């Protein structure tokens, strides 16, 4: 009953913002899924459940973005753009389950496709997240909407002359900052890191100077600091887009919930600019009553 109430509450928020519903099957052709997965040099389909019928390979949907892209491609001539759609349903991940990761869970999705003012659309996504959490009963102190822009870090890596083939691994290493801290990230950026279990993860093999510059960048918390310290044109463009986003959000009621955090870079390579990652500011309890950390609860970006 509680889950149904939460679903109905969030759905009404999406409707209030002018989004229309779309339902898609839980299966997709495997060929339609691949480009939406995290890069895995050895097995790009390692995160999904694969099945084969008599004719073709099928995949349980990993998220709701790939089905949307397939739907839009098939119905492009019949849709009115910008096309605003929401969807919810179960998604499936072939990964090791733990306290904050599940192999199956219900996901809500809101996307805007087509030409529109980027800052306004990105701000709308932030406001949808805020209204959804508040309407579900959380107060403003219980969650934070962290925003960043992928161009900022991409520009820095270009400035530091980090080779293209290393850049994705660098981003993945930085994405682990909350879990392993700056020292752990530094190890991953250099030769590698051994975790508590003894498992060794090969590093990115960057130079000491490159690692030092990246770790210094991760300490920048304000727009003014970013504008002062970053000179690469792509980084400057990303900071400007972030500044425009915050200006639009400031006209509404949710600006106090939004925080700039350039360490939030998301794991998927298809993101191209604006990034958002929402975190709870409290610990939850599992079925055994043990306190656990909950990962990102509402995240995404421009792609």
Spans of model-derived segments:
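Phosphate/dinucleotide-binding and metal-coordinating scaffold of catalytic cores
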Residues: 80
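Polyanion/phosphate-binding surface patch
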Residues: 26-58, 101
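Charged, amphipathic alpha-helical linkers/stalks
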Residues: 135, 159-160
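Acidic, His- and aromatic-enriched active-site or binding-groove loops in soluble protein domains
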Residues: 42-53, 160-191, 280, 284
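Positively charged, Gly/Ser-enriched RNA/tRNA-binding surfaces
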Residues: 2-17, 28-29, 55, 65-77, ...
């Amino acid at each position: 009953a509680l889950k149904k109430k939460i679903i109905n509450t969030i759905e009404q928020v999406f409707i209030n913002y002018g989004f229309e519903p779309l339902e898609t099957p839980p299966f997709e052709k495997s060929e339609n899924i691949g480009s939406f997965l995290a890069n895995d040099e050895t097995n790009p389909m390692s995160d999904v459940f694969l099945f084969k019928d008599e004719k073709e390979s099928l995949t349980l949907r990993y998220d709701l973005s790939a089905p949307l892209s397939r739907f839009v491609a098939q119905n492009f001539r019949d849709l009115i753009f910008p096309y605003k759609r929401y969807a919810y349903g179960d998604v499936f991940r072939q990964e090791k389950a733990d306290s904050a990761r599940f192999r199956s869970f219900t996901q809500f999705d809101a996307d805007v496709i087509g030409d529109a003012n980027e800052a306004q659309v990105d701000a709308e996504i932030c406001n949808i997240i805020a209204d959804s959490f508040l309407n579900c009963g959380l107060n403003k102190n219980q969650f934070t909407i962290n925003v960043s822009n992928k161009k900022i870090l991409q520009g820095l890596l270009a400035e530091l002359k980090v080779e293209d083939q290393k850049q994705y691994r660098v981003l993945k290493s930085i994405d682990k900052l909350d879990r392993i801290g700056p020292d752990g990230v530094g190890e991953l950026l250099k030769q590698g890191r051994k975790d508590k279990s003894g498992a060794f993860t090969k590093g990115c093999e960057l130079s000491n100077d490159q690692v030092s510059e990246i770790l210094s960048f991760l300490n920048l918390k304000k727009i003014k600091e970013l504008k002062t310290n970053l000179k690469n044109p792509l980084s400057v463009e990303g900071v400007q887009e972030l500044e425009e986003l915050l200006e639009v959000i400031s006209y509404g009621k949710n600006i106090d919930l939004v925080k700039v955090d350039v360490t939030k870079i998301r794991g998927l390579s298809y993101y191209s600019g604006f990034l958002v990652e929402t975190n709870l500011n409290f610990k939850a309890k599992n079925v055994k009553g043990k306190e656990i950390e909950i990962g990102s609860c509402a995240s995404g970006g421009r792609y």
